[in-house]
Amino acid sequence: MGMPFIKHVRAFTVRGGGADYHDQGGGHWIDDHIATPMSKYPEYRQSRQSFGINVLGTLVVEIEASDGTVGFSVTTGGDLGCFIVEKHLARFLEGARVTDIEKMWDQMYSATLYYGRKGIVINTISGVDLALWDLLAKIRKEPVHALLGGPVRDELIFYATGARPDLARQMGFIGGKMPLHHAPAEREEGLAKNLDMIGDMRSKVGKDFWLMLDCWMSLDVEYATRLATAARNEHGLKWIEEALSPDDYWGYAELRRNVPRGMLVTTGEHEATRWGFRLLLEMGCCDIIQPDVGWCGGITELIKISNLADAHGKLVVPHGSSVYSYHFVITRQNSPFAEFLMMAPKADEVVPMFNPQLLDEPVPVNGRIKASALDAPGFGVRLNPDIALHRPYPRQAA
């Protein structure tokens, strides 16, 4: 019996946390005076939700095969992503063999070049691609990582992103990455507060625990150089992440030349496709690239990005993304550790990143996840049936 074909594609929106992890209630650390490109405007400085960071919502993509198997994924994209899936991308999927993932990716990308390339369109293509890998692996009754060549290590080790690296150390993580709170618009006083925060956290975690700083595209080269130099020399900061606009490749190259020896410059969370990462790598912009598999083009594109980085001798440490990253990282020698996003409001406990949208999502125990915890078919997670799905652009089955 041959491989089934794709029978139908469906796209839904969901509100409230999950894949759009910024869509949280009040009092969550992830929305507490964090430096952003909008920090130059005082009225948008205190809360990231104030400028609309959570407007997209979650995109859920379901792909049903002719044998009844359903693959799915979640990413950011919301109503806009649903429109792109149902009105444009579905034509390249329905009727295709489930194994033709490379061809489907190329058709989706090529057909959207005139309005896509990055942003919401690549987010959406990423979501479709992840659902295709989930579907194929379920049909083959294998985990996605088996389709990618299998594990190269027995467990994943994690650093934690959140407001409390001191608690992350107690939970067994290898390091902690904090959000930057004050942007250049807050002048010297803000810079001093940033350095005080890093110094205070260093005193709590000790000298051997990794401390990193997530700047979320909020700085300029001069400020980032001053911050990185002082934080490295005074407090042993391991890396400075996404300090500049993702479009400023020249600035990243300059920043990397400027920082102290041993200080790492990392970026790539908001970069997309092999062509974007080619610029980062060839221009010497960073030491570690951090593609988000739900935003950079999916697994199909992340394979190419990772191979490109490997040829340049650079590490790939994907941004967040839970199981969608785990199944990839466990198969790659140049991805020696992974990120875990602390989604508890106070960053004081380990909870699933995509809660409440996904069920059976594994979480680190003592900062680790065994490879065997990823052995269920597909990505090993289920969509929570209690979540209210909305399909804004329904179609008849092909």
From Swiss-Prot:
Catalytic activity: L-rhamnonate = 2-dehydro-3-deoxy-L-rhamnonate + H2O
Keyword set, alphabetical order: Lyase, Magnesium, Metal-binding
Binding site for Mg(2+): 214, 241, 269
GO MF, any single term: L-rhamnonate dehydratase activity
Biological-process GO terms, alphabetical: amino acid catabolic process; carbohydrate catabolic process
Enzyme kind, highest EC tier: lyase
UniProt-listed Enzyme Commission number(s): 4.2.1.90
Residue positions binding substrate: 22, 48, 339
SUPFAM superfamilies, sorted: Enolase C-terminal domain-like (SSF51604), Enolase N-terminal domain-like (SSF54826)
Annotated site residue numbers, Increases basicity of active site His: 292
Pfam family, one: MR_MLE_C
Active site: 319
Superkingdom field: Bacteria
Site features described as Transition state stabilizer, chain residue numbers: 339
Oligomer status and interactors: Homooctamer; tetramer of dimers.
Family under the similarity heading: Belongs to the mandelate racemase/muconate lactonizing enzyme family. RhamD subfamily.
Functional note: Catalyzes the dehydration of L-rhamnonate to 2-keto-3-deoxy-L-rhamnonate (KDR).
Further comment found in the protein's record: Reaction proceeds via a syn dehydration.
The protein's name in its UniProt record: L-rhamnonate dehydratase
Organism of origin: Verminephrobacter eiseniae (strain EF01-2)
Gene: rhmD
